[in-house]
A protein has these predicted regions:
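Core AdoMet radical
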Residues: 1-74, 84-87, 113-118
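Generic structural signal for well-ordered alpha-helices
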Residues: 10-15, 37, 72-75, 104, ...
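Hydrophobic positions in alpha-helices of CheY-like receiver
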Residues: 13-17, 78, 146, 150
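Alpha-helix N-cap and loop-to-helix initiation/capping positions
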Residues: 5-9, 63-70, 95-102, 130-138
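Catalytic cores of alpha/beta
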Residues: 32-43, 92-108, 162-175
Length: 217
């Protein structure tokens, strides 16, 4: 996202959020120029989200529009602009478990503050539509792997959790995650946020308040 008009809209949205709430701001904007990221930082942006998608050794089988190095540079540009970063990937795209380990260490080496875990939901007609959905215990092992490699960051489970973990989603927390993304996702629907809150309350957990989030930044 490097269109000037679109950039100005995002900057204005960030300014309003910072002025009217006590929320932290995070944007997911794709491949960005360093100067534009600096403008967003000056507007009040706290964090930039950018996924590596998959391991470097598997990347060319999944992405053809740009390189793995472009993904890494996007994260590093955000850091150069003074932003925290949120870096994750999508699991279940035909990669081996060793390639998940590879991705985990690549994310660790970038120094991310948080990591979103997405599980592929194969969609007919797409390049990965022929793949099988990642198995339940394989998903839990992947969460545990990421927690082992990255013991101190925020690790949250996002797209695909409803399909992969079904009615046992609460186990993602015992596997090592400490958060979830609620609502709908980029191309798929999520479950009712009220159901998420009920699950969290049943586990005796409590989401942090915005004051607690900001005080720990």
């Amino acid at each position: 996202m490097n269109d000037r008009q679109e950039l100005e809209r995002v900057k204005e949205a960030v300014r309003r959020i910072k002025a009217e709430t006590n929320l932290e701001t995070c944007c997911s904007l794709g491949l960005m120029e360093l100067d534009h990221l600096k403008e967003l930082r000056e507007a009040g942006l706290d964090r930039c989200h950018h996924n590596l998608e998959t391991a470097a050794s598997h990347f060319e089988k999944i992405v053809t529009t740009h390189t793995y190095e472009d993904e890494v540079n996007a994260v590093q540009n955000a850091q150069k602009a003074g932003l925290d970063v949120c870096v994750g990937g999508i699991f279940g795209m035909g990669e081996s478990f060793n390639q998940r380990v590879e991705l985990a260490f690549s994310i660790r080496d970038l120094g991310t503050q948080s990591l979103p875990i997405n599980f592929l939901k194969p969609i007919e007609g797409t390049g990965t539509g022929h793949l099988e959905t990642i198995e339940y215990y394989d998903a839990l092992k992947t969460i545990a792997l990421l927690r082992l490699v990255l013991p101190k960051i925020d690790l949250f489970v996002c797209g695909g959790r409803e399909e992969v973990l079904t009615d046992k989603q609460e186990r993602l927390f015992s596997a090592g995650a400490n958060g979830i993304l609620g609502g709908n996702y980029l191309t798929t629907k999520g479950q009712d946020p009220k159901r998420d809150m009920s699950m969290i309350e049943d586990l005796g957990l409590r989401p942090p308040t915005s004051w607690e989030v900001n005080s720990n930044s």
